[in-house]
């Protein structure tokens, strides 16, 4: 072993012994930096015992320190990973974190302080390469998130201002590391068949970390090449199915064919569509129109179902809560008391959550399909994803992509700056392209603009403005943000280059924390009561207390001066407030005189003579009483009319029901009267002489004959008339007969 190798090994042992004595844990150091005060000054100054003994053999101390720290981290991580134990892994990560913090805290003591940035990036990249699984990567990653400002310092020894970064993508130390980390991301992207949830979590955190390292105006931090993403199709084999010969033209096959045609000819190639001929645009329109009709029809059913469910829920809530609206969405369910105190329930609950946690932890390592990806190659799955009414995620995703694409096409056709920018970027990436950017006539431009406006404005935005205003506002804001981002991209993000955050410290606001005693509520503790007994000096302030009598005299003097001057000046701005203050002062002494005060007189009403109120005469009282009781009388009249009408209807119904009885009664009366008449005649014949009876009969017959009209002819001419009248009105006939019988009876009685 050479002297240098022995020096390195001894230095590593020295660091292990020194770092092991620090009172710090892995959970604390990965979230909070290690303060420099915890490390001895000799350690930070590189006054290590092995180095002091061989100081003559050291030519480049900074390079030697870098080698020692790298070997220290590699040894710590290798031993921890080989043991495959949780405690050893945390010990290795703890040593690595302490080593990185040591580089930062000792940056001023280097021969070349600017070299600390390269060392920090190199050691950090070494640790990332040694983490052999996503779980260990995620365990260590809070350290990188908590030290993001250290990375932005680059080679500077002073911290950068908030929002700024000294890193440049094409310069060290980030240049090589950025390429290496992009290769890691590419491997994760290409190896998605075997990726688990933690792989995707690791990929997201690394991408987010790289985007935060560089400023926003850095070319590597945005899509400077203006390339269009075509990554909608899932690369995961779990979302694919074996292709079969599609002989039938079912609805799912037609739907999938139209969707794929629109996706490959419009969404992922807006530049080709914008500068294509009319036939190409018409072909896309023929596939897009029925596809959009079908999707919007399903969306309409989706919102109708939501509206119906809400109406049902609201009706139930209204029926249950007639006076109060119950918002059950904000109510937190409470656990019943018997479940809280039941040991059996507690054991079952703990077992359930333990099993659920185990399932979740084991599920992180399980291969699974990416369910949020659209399966373009699976016809049945694609049809179900976009036509399922209960799930609108995939439809909303397609609608957003369609709006962004049509909006970009409109900008390409109408804006010369946008067209020139995308043209230069496209030709730089595809120099052999056959797109003719200059051969776009007015008819073709008009057709493209009309098609994009019809799809985006007339179909999509108008539909969601009525059905879903919230999503409509989301689309509008995203489109506006996309236009602003495109404008900034064309300008090279120059507006962010001059963006500087002020380095002046904002002084904290001064608070008066002195206590002023205004009131006091007695507490049960005497010590607390004594705290309130603080001499504030408020009791020593001399303040003249106003008495009600003095205020009354001042108000009266003011009123008298107003009367004597006979001037009605304009009311002061705060006159109402002053009068209220005066009344508050007078309340304790002159409360029973306040009946003289009203809105018109104000305080002056206390001193004015009370006006005599004219007594109301009897006629006025009667009119007033009549007006008050008018509505009551109207209700009484309506009630009487209702009662009379009800009685009339009842009487009419009774008469209709009693008509047959009346008719029977009349007939019986007629028979009785006839029989009585015959009996009287027989009796009279027996009592009177025969001569008198004959004379009477003669008189009656002569009178009957004389009563007939001599011009009427034979009496038989009148028989049909009487018969017809009798047929037309049989009741009249019966009445006449009864009348005649009664008259005959009476005449018979007279004769008798």
Curated annotation (Swiss-Prot):
GO cellular-component term (any): THO complex part of transcription export complex
Keyword Transport applies: no
Short name of any one Pfam family annotated for the protein: efThoc1
Coiled coil: none
One function term, GO molecular function aspect: molecular adaptor activity
UniProt feature, compositional bias: Basic and acidic residues: 692-702
Compositionally biased spans, kind Polar residues: 720-752
Residues recorded as bearing Phosphoserine in the entry: 234
Cell compartments where the protein resides: Nucleus
One Gene Ontology biological process: mRNA export from nucleus
Keywords: Nucleus, Phosphoprotein, Transcription, Transcription regulation
Region (Disordered): 648-752
Keyword Ubl conjugation on entry: no
UniProt main location, coarse: nucleus
Remaining remarks: HPR1 is not required for sporulation, and is not essential for DNA repair. It is probably not a DNA topoisomerase.
Stated role: Component the THO subcomplex of the TREX complex, which operates in coupling transcription elongation to mRNA export. The THO complex is recruited to transcribed genes and moves along the gene with the elongating polymerase during transcription. THO is important for stabilizing nascent RNA in the RNA polymerase II elongation complex by preventing formation of DNA:RNA hybrids behind the elongating polymerase.
Subunit details: Component of the THO complex, which is composed of HPR1, MFT1, THO2 and THP2. Together with SUB2, TEX1 and YRA1, THO forms the transcription/export (TREX) complex. THO associates with DNA and RNA in vitro.
Name listed for the protein in its UniProt record: THO complex subunit HPR1
Gene source species: Saccharomyces cerevisiae (strain ATCC 204508 / S288c)
